[in-house]
């Protein structure tokens, strides 16, 4: 068999696997008796997959114009048949988790404490003070996620929401050169959007979902997830509204990770804690966003500065990773191991 025929066969097998395991296009609800017009209403409201419908609360479906209580119940029943949300055995879950892909960070030491790299299907939060390497740690996976699986990649595209205006395509070209990838192809495979306020940032997630149903994405970056909340909401009077808005945004991110299996990486800013000990040990930093941000993140990483371009990453919380530290370096070609 020729190499072209083998590639075609491999692509067909991958496509068949996606059909069997999802995400399922929302149009599949029509086969379960849902009218095409109602499917269009769901799609127009930002629900592009059957999974998205299955994860949506009934009261949210009722807010969609033209969806009555009877229709909502019928839609929920149809979605639950395609995407079962009941119990499964721990052995089945274990088998599914063995198939989870990790995207390399570019540093072997960092990959080691992450047990392979950035995990797909979950949210990884990176926080630290300015110049601690948060944005650089977002740029490198945008390239490495395009690598083949056997090279620590995800064989998919990247999506980047930039709230601070710090995204630099030329850095991606330098990183692509390091990994032997075509620079033009790498840039073409990164979808970029600048977010200007918290509402716009949330709307971009709806657009992201429609893009992910069309093509394979392996990574989604939001840099920073909290920057706009610090400016759009001010004072204690708006604290409750800020936290509610942030909780909905983070929940939408988790839904994208669940629906499409993408690795979601978000950066977070910090605030200095000034107390009596700061006089002797220097100011201590804590991430903003409170408990809502802490609970939304699957894996939480803290960055701090070392000597020169050296940075230290510490695993703060994770359901399966040990609390550990790794040293890495900020280089022109992205995140790399420290050269002793």
From Swiss-Prot:
Main location: nucleus
Residues in HhH domain copies: 49-78
Highest taxon in the source lineage: Eukaryota
InterPro entries: AAA+_ATPase, DNA_recomb/repair_Rad51, DNA_recomb/repair_Rad51_C, DNA_recomb/repair_RecA-like, DNA_repair_Rad51/TF_NusA_a-hlx, P-loop_NTPase, RecA_ATP-bd, RecA_monomer-monomer_interface
Annotated Low complexity bias: 1-14
GO annotations of cellular component type: condensed nuclear chromosome
Tissue: Highly expressed in mitotic and meiotic tissues, but low levels in differentiated tissues.
UniProt record, GO biological process: chromosome organization involved in meiotic cell cycle; DNA recombinase assembly; DNA strand invasion; mitotic recombination; mitotic recombination-dependent replication fork processing; reciprocal meiotic recombination
Keywords: ATP-binding, DNA damage, DNA recombination, DNA repair, DNA-binding, Nucleotide-binding, Nucleus
Keyword ATP-binding: yes
Xref: Pfam families: HHH_5, Rad51
Disulfide links within the chain: none
Annotated compartments: Nucleus
GO molecular function: ATP binding; ATP hydrolysis activity; ATP-dependent activity, acting on DNA; ATP-dependent DNA damage sensor activity; DNA strand exchange activity; double-stranded DNA binding; single-stranded DNA binding
Binding annotation for ATP: 128-135
Transmembrane regions listed in the UniProt entry: none
Region Disordered, annotated ranges: 1-21
Alphabetical list of PANTHER family matching this protein: DNA REPAIR PROTEIN RAD51 HOMOLOG A, RECA/RAD51/RADA DNA STRAND-PAIRING FAMILY MEMBER
Function: Binds to single and double-stranded DNA and exhibits DNA-dependent ATPase activity. Unwinds duplex DNA. Component of the meiotic recombination pathway. Seems to play a role in mediating chromosome homology search, chromosome pairing and synapsis at early stages and probably chromosome crossing-over at later stages in meiosis. Probably is involved in the repair of meiotic double strand breaks (DBSs) and in homologous recombination.
UniProt record similarity statement: Belongs to the RecA family. RAD51 subfamily.
Assembly mode: Self-associates and may interact with XRCC3 homolog.
NCBIfam families with a match to the protein in the record: PRK04301.1, recomb_RAD51
Name the UniProt record assigns to this protein: DNA repair protein RAD51 homolog A
Source organism: Zea mays
The encoding gene: RAD51A
């Amino acid at each position: 068999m020729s190499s072209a025929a083998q590639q075609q066969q491999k692509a067909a097998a991958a496509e068949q696997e996606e059909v069997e395991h999802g995400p399922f296009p929302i149009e599949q609800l029509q086969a379960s008796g849902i009218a095409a017009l109602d499917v269009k209403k769901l799609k127009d409201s930002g629900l592009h997959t059957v999974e998205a419908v299955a994860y949506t609360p009934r009261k949210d479906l009722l807010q969609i114009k033209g969806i009555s209580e009877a229709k909502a119940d019928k839609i929920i029943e149809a979605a639950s048949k395609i995407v079962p949300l009941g119990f499964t055995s721990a052995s089945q879950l274990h088998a599914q988790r063995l198939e989870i892909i990790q995207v390399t960070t570019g540093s072997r030491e960092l990959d080691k404490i992450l047990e392979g790299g950035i995990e797909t299907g979950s949210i990884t939060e990176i926080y630290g003070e300015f110049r601690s390497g948060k944005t650089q740690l977002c740029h490198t996976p945008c390239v490495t996620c395009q690598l083949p699986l056997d090279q620590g990649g995800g064989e998919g595209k990247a999506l980047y929401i930039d709230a601070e205006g710090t995204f630099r395509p030329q850095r991606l070209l330098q990183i692509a050169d390091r990994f032997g990838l075509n620079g033009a192809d790498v840039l073409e495979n990164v979808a970029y959007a600048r977010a200007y306020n918290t509402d716009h940032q949330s709307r971009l997630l709806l657009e992201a979902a429609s893009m992910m149903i069309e093509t394979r994405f392996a990574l989604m970056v939001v840099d920073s997830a909290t920057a706009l909340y610090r400016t759009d909401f001010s004072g204690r009077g708006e604290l409750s509204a800020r936290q509610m808005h942030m909780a909905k945004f983070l929940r939408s991110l988790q839904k994208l990770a669940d629906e499409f299996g993408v690795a979601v990486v978000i950066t977070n800013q910090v605030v200095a804690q000034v107390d009596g000990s700061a006089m002797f040990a220097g100011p201590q930093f804590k991430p903003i966003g409170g408990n809502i941000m802490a609970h939304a993140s699957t894996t939480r990483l803290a960055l701090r500065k070392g000597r020169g371009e050296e940075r230290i990453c510490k695993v703060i919380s994770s359901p399966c990773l040990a609390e550990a530290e790794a040293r890495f370096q900020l280089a022109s070609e992205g995140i790399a191991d420290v050269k002793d």
